[in-house]
């Protein structure tokens, strides 16, 4: 999965997919009542990027739905996975459940069209704080209450705080999550970061009793870093330059080992070769 980083305006969906992304990451900011409000990152953000592009969250979802619905004039067949980077650190811990409920309602209405031919992409809820695990339970409960528990088949999870992997496992246990787990590791492109924790996450993924299904590394803009991440065995790379990642994947060392994921590839299944 080549994950286009910081896609917060509808026009950027086409821009990053056309450069080779089959996945995008979108920032979600919340108001003080835990309503998802804008797709917005803000300052500071990655080196070499504009940090302030934004849409109202529900408007962005409507654009995203068009981009991921076969038959729509804006349909992008390659776009199969969306990571919502939930900026829930602005909330009190006791608002996490409400944030999850409100997020589920927004997605249900504006993305899934209440189960009536909505967008088809898989969704990862990426949460920055282990204490906010109730965001997951609130989200799940709401889809059930609203009569669409089947949509949880399209939803996965990530805790993005670079926490100790054992602590991440505990948070999932509290949230009742077994499966659909993506594990991120990384840092802004302005700073270097080693691959030690990525390798730990990959080892967990590949062990018989691990809880992780997929591992992604962020934010990677250089060919050398891309090669390091691929050599470590990641499933996804988040980048500001999807074309750079696509280039490296076409190198002889990688093209026989990796291919770009399509809609037929289940993002919740651990890859076994």
Swiss-Prot record:
Location of the protein in the cell: Secreted
Top-level lineage group: Eukaryota
Residues noted as binding Mg(2+) in the record, renumbered to the chain: 25, 27, 85
Catalytic activity: an N-(acyl)-sphingosylphosphocholine = an N-(acyl)-sphingosyl-1,3-cyclic phosphate + choline; an N-(acyl)-sphingosylphosphoethanolamine = an N-(acyl)-sphingosyl-1,3-cyclic phosphate + ethanolamine; a 1-acyl-sn-glycero-3-phosphocholine = a 1-acyl-sn-glycero-2,3-cyclic phosphate + choline; a 1-acyl-sn-glycero-3-phosphoethanolamine = a 1-acyl-sn-glycero-2,3-cyclic phosphate + ethanolamine
EC class of the enzyme, as a word: lyase
Any single Gene Ontology cellular-component annotation: extracellular region
InterPro entries named in the record: PLC-like_Pdiesterase_TIM-brl
Catalytic center residues: 5, 41
UniProt EC number: 4.6.1.-
Single annotated GO MF: phosphoric diester hydrolase activity
GO terms, biological process: killing of cells of another organism; lipid catabolic process
Keyword Lyase: yes
Cofactor annotation comment: Binds 1 Mg(2+) ion per subunit.
Tissue distribution of the protein: Expressed by the venom gland.
Keywords: Cytolysis, Dermonecrotic toxin, Disulfide bond, Hemolysis, Lipid degradation, Lipid metabolism, Lyase, Magnesium, Metal-binding, Secreted, Toxin
Needed cofactors: Mg(2+)
Annotated disulfide bonds: 45-51, 47-190
Entry's family note: Belongs to the arthropod phospholipase D family. Class II subfamily.
Protein function: Dermonecrotic toxins cleave the phosphodiester linkage between the phosphate and headgroup of certain phospholipids (sphingolipid and lysolipid substrates), forming an alcohol (often choline) and a cyclic phosphate. This toxin acts on sphingomyelin (SM). It may also act on ceramide phosphoethanolamine (CPE), lysophosphatidylcholine (LPC) and lysophosphatidylethanolamine (LPE), but not on lysophosphatidylserine (LPS), and lysophosphatidylglycerol (LPG). It acts by transphosphatidylation, releasing exclusively cyclic phosphate products as second products.
Name of the molecule in the record: Dermonecrotic toxin LdSicTox-alphaIB3av
Annotated organism of origin: Loxosceles deserta (Desert recluse spider)
